[in-house]
């Protein structure tokens, strides 16, 4: 499994913890490291941490904007009705599409679908794909993705 994939998985777990326990990013990250650093088998490798932390902090900082985009693209679904896992996977992908210029949007979408299949319900992959497929053209139309290869 690649470094960024592991970073996304870690970020998903931390974002989930933040929402469940109503924790700020730094506290949630600290608890995550505390929990896993003592366990050799599950210790988070140093190379995974920076991107995971960037995602966690970025999603937290830009959450209102990210949630607004998800809400506008999700017909008949309020954000609060979405599963906690799906909602945070969507947040990660939208954060990447908005702020991680070195990651092609299609990669962010495919990674989100894979995370949904791994951590979500049997329908999560298709649900996540549908929402992100609505968001991508909006970003392209607003010139947000013109600096990257979206193919």
Curated annotation (Swiss-Prot):
Keywords: RNA-binding, Transcription, Transcription antitermination, Transcription regulation. InterPro entries: NusB-like_sf, NusB_fam, NusB_RsmB_TIM44. GO terms for cellular component: cytosol. The keyword Transcription applies. SUPFAM superfamilies: NusB-like. It holds the Pfam family NusB. One of its GO terms (biological process) is transcription antitermination. One of its GO terms (molecular function) is RNA binding. Belongs to the NusB family. NCBIfam families: nusB (TIGR01951). Involved in transcription antitermination. Required for transcription of ribosomal RNA (rRNA) genes. Binds specifically to the boxA antiterminator sequence of the ribosomal RNA (rrn) operons. This is Transcription antitermination protein NusB. It comes from Syntrophobacter fumaroxidans (strain DSM 10017 / MPOB). The gene is nusB.
């Amino acid at each position: 499994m690649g470094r960024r994939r592991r970073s996304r998985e870690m970020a998903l777990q931390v974002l989930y913890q933040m929402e469940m326990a109503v924790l700020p990013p730094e506290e949630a990250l600290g608890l995550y490291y505390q929990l896993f650093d003592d366990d050799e088998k599950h210790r988070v490798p140093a190379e995974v941490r920076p991107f995971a932390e960037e995602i966690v902090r970025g999603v937290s900082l830009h959450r209102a904007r990210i949630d607004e985009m998800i809400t506008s693209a999700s017909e008949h679904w309020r954000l609060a009705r979405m599963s906690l896992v799906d909602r945070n996977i969507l947040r990660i992908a939208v954060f990447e599409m908005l702020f991680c210029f070195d990651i092609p949007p299609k990669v962010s979408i495919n990674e989100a679908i894979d995370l949904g299949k791994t951590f979500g319900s049997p329908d999560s992959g298709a649900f996540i794909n549908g929402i992100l497929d609505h968001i991508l053209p909006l970003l392209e139309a607003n010139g947000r993705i013109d600096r990257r290869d979206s193919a």
